[in-house]
Amino acid sequence: MTAQDSTQTEDRKDDHLQIVQERDVETTGTGFDDVHLVHNALPELDYDAIDPSIDFLGHDLSAPIFIESMTGGHHNTTEINRALARAASETGIAMGLGSQRAGLELDDERVLESYTVVRDAAPDAFIYGNLGAAQLREYDIEMVEQAVEMIDADALAVHLNFLQEATQPEGDVDGRNCVAAIERVSEALSVPIIVKETGNGISGETARELTAAGVDALDVAGKGGTTWSGIEAYRAAAANAPRQKQIGTLFREWGIPTAASTIECVAEHDCVIASGGVRTGLDVAKAIALGARAGGLAKPFLKPATDGPDAVIERVGDLIAELRTAMFVTGSGSIDELQQVEYVLHGKTREYVEQRTSSE
């Protein structure tokens, strides 16, 4: 990476953080409003005895809630990551990092600290790293292992963000040979691989390919939350790149709604994280009833993180209380039981799923 590329990468990270904090980057239409869990008027449970803990890739988590990959790669993100990591450690949930490409390719101690601070703040938490699928084609296994070692990661997320790349003036739009790269790394890496989208969802067909490639988990990151094409549209406007702005705006609402993507992915893989517009513990409960193992949130943790770890801990506590309430009124004493709860599918999500199923 050249010095110019290095500066560009770091500046892009800072741009993204500022835009997410200051601009309208939310979409709608996760599909969770179309999912109705069947109420149990006689749950025969002690609320205080409800156990929301899970085993995830051999690690015990206190609740099926993930702090999704967001930040890293700019010194402005260090304190945010410190707060998120401390909260993950205190509450016993999982946390993902943003792309570690900058940490691998830039010779900058402040950039590196934006990543390493996470393990320093959370020595025992489940922390997973992050690289792009496009980078896997370029890196040998030793380079990928460096990303793992950088934060003593328990797993590595491989993100798929080709729509975002297509809307960036400097984007990498060569999508070839990524499945082979993912399979190569899945076979050789020392930790499990989680493949995640970045706001546009994973289809059943793609989930099937990834399952065959040997990945350990899928994170659907569907439509309905933060829109990265929308974020890039703001960047393009500031960079006087009207065509990229137009494309980013046009595809702002593009993707598979999170609920539908979850349904498709759980039919192909037995370890699925539902993210993308997840905002409450009830959303997490619905995702689990659809078959997900856990639910993930990113942007809802960003503002609390700027206020410090206690604010993040409070937000996690709210989510767990909402989840436990949903478990109580569905008669679910455990997450395994919540996965078996009956639900009714309505509206556009039902239409989407029925049409997709009938076309197979």
Curated annotation (Swiss-Prot):
One of its GO terms (cellular component) is cytoplasm. It catalyses: isopentenyl diphosphate = dimethylallyl diphosphate. It is an enzyme of class 5 (isomerase). One of its GO terms (molecular function) is isopentenyl-diphosphate delta-isomerase activity. Its cofactor is FMN; NADPH; Mg(2+). Signal peptide: none annotated. Belongs to the IPP isomerase type 2 family. HAMAP family: Idi_2 (MF_00354). This is Isopentenyl-diphosphate delta-isomerase. It comes from Halobacterium salinarum (strain ATCC 700922 / JCM 11081 / NRC-1) (Halobacterium halobium).
